[in-house]
């Protein structure tokens, strides 16, 4: 999914200050990690620059890298494709934690449709593409593969073990290993780095795959949504029990859009309060407010680098705003092949600093 979401003026100031801080030497108790997503997108054209970006990330020596999904733009959703991406993750010389986006399963189209989209289809392929947008075919999802089967394959390739990806994997706690109600959710991970709790949630773009014209997908989406909310709650419960200094949450979907929110959130929720992301937003908002310490939410999906506070709700003059402890980092995406180095220093009140990583 791609959209444009411009930086707000005050967010630009925030970025500037935090980038300067990120360049300073780290204290003994501090560490850094890297976040990226929506890359490498246009294959194989993007791969040389993606390889240089991986080298740049490795040179930064992060504790780990988080990839927030959309590992390609459009590609057949086959085990071969997934394993090819897995091989690229092996080029990172440190742990890689990956949470799925929409392009690698919810948006998976039949190969004939992909060829036509790419302009290399046969006459028959092009005819199928044209017919795919007619009402009966669109309503029946005829241009898609079995996306739930694709998700099963994706899980078997990327999440076969209770550990991260990358050439130097680290152990992870996974929701699917410890919660019998959500045993399929092996992609939801949690770990502790120097007193900061990290967690990933499987929340893709494309309406979180809530499909009112597909009963099986809608049921699976509702179950996954409940699992994500339970994982968010348990993450903050662990953070409170361990007196963690901060919490970092990572998922794929851009859950906010341009426009003012209301008393519930400062920015408008994508799809509205009752839409596919509303309950995830409210769970993060309320558990983060109760936690009271710095919380960082990382997402991709919109392909635009943003640092802001979309949860924050201003109060009356002289009153502190609500939910101002939640900062959001939205990572770069195609056509840019870039990442963000995040420094973590719990000796500072803001905890998080940000430094874009570029390659030619």
Regions of interest found by a model, annotated:
Residues 2-14:
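Bacterial N-terminal signal peptides that target proteins for export
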Residues 55-64, 192, 199, 215-311:
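His/acidic metal-ligating clusters that form di-metal
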Residues 42-44, 73-75, 103-109, 207-211, ...:
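Active-site environment of divalent metal-dependent phosphoester hydrolases
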Residues 38, 65, 70, 101, ...:
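Divalent metal-coordination and catalytic microenvironments
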Residues 80-227, 231, 312-343:
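Extended active-site neighborhood of metal-dependent phosphoesterases/phosphodiesterases
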Residues 340-360:
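A short C-terminal boundary segment appended to hydrolase-like catalytic domains
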Residues 27-84, 88, 244:
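N-terminal active-site segment of His-dependent metallophosphoesterases
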Residues 12-23:
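Bacterial N-terminal signal peptides
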